[in-house]
Amino acid sequence: MMSQLAAPHVTTPHQDGFAMPAEWAPHDAVWMIWPYRTDNWREQGVPAQKTFARVAEAIAQNTPVIMGVPARYMADAQKVMPVNVTLVEMESDDAWMRDTGPTIVLNQAGERRGIDWQFNAWGGELGGLYEDWRQDEKVAAQVLDYHQAAGYAAPLILEGGSIHVDGEGTLLTTAECLLNPNRNPHLSKAEIEQLMRDYLSISTIIWLEEGVYNDETDGHIDNMCCFVRPGEVALHWTDDENDPQYARSVAAYEVLSAARDAQGRELKIWKLPAPGPLHATKEEAQGVDSGDAVERLAGSRLAGSYVNFLISNQQIIFPLLDEKTDDVARDLLQQMFPDYLISGVPAREILLGGGNIHCITQQIPTAK
């Protein structure tokens, strides 16, 4: 089947009446990618693969899960993945569907299209996490083909984890990532903001200066802060003034407290406590092969965050990261989402690879 993106729309989603819905809008499916890079996932990827299977199993309670799997690993995936997960042959360079997959936009008639952003492995030659991302660049088009959705080729390097929207005109992001010179150095802040308006149909952008400390994505918003519902956000928080995260969280809180969303509302801010601090062990670091990917070092601070959860069809799938704080996070999430199923999945193996549950998933909002 010829790619719908072979001749992408020359207009923009906003011109055509399309907008990115909030994550709590209904989903037809959630996509994931099989983790296989032995220079990123320890012990030949086996612990991560088992963890991805548990995440898929949790999501599949309410939402169909589709997983892209390189052909050479299909037999392995069939042994590990739950039978109700649809496995689709798809090449990739790593397993971060949030960042390489398409951003789906809908119009008032319920039609579905997708945005294929440019991708450079979180920084290209200036801090990118691996050297060759040519397969990753093809992922979004393949997902759109699967759903027979037409697409827009956006003239912007952007990962899905760097944006959150409330579905009512407001976008959250971080300057640390979106204005990083290793992403779109030729574009000004004003030009990037205009592209956000053109492609996502938002009107108000709330800029946090930084994301989570030592986040190798250059501070993705989806690890730091997200919308709970219109007018409410969850923020990664620590009360420890000696922690390098403290100043980042306080600065974000001040911005959010002063902000007004696209509808003129003040924001209610939920503080989600940081786990840990968490660090990679010697055993964990030694289990990763040397290769093209960024080196995994024993003792390195892990950017663990409970904000890195997925909202899908009245369910929250969140990472279990620290026995001391997991229950606190669960209770807070249940308060934030009183009518939702709250599903925790042990997720340290994902964190060791550089992200978490939101980073490895990408929702396909329901078309009417």
UniProtKB/Swiss-Prot annotation:
SUPFAM superfamilies: Pentein (SSF55909). It is an enzyme of class 3 (hydrolase). Keywords: Hydrolase. Signal peptide: none annotated. Its EC number is 3.5.3.12. GO terms for biological process: putrescine biosynthetic process. The active site is at C359 (amidino-cysteine intermediate). Coiled coil: none annotated. GO terms for molecular function: agmatine deiminase activity; protein-arginine deiminase activity. Pfam families: PAD_porph. It catalyses: agmatine + H2O = N-carbamoylputrescine + NH4(+). NCBIfam families: agmatine_aguA, PRK13551.1. Belongs to the agmatine deiminase family. This is Putative agmatine deiminase. The lineage of its organism: Bacteria, Pseudomonadati, Pseudomonadota, Gammaproteobacteria, Enterobacterales.
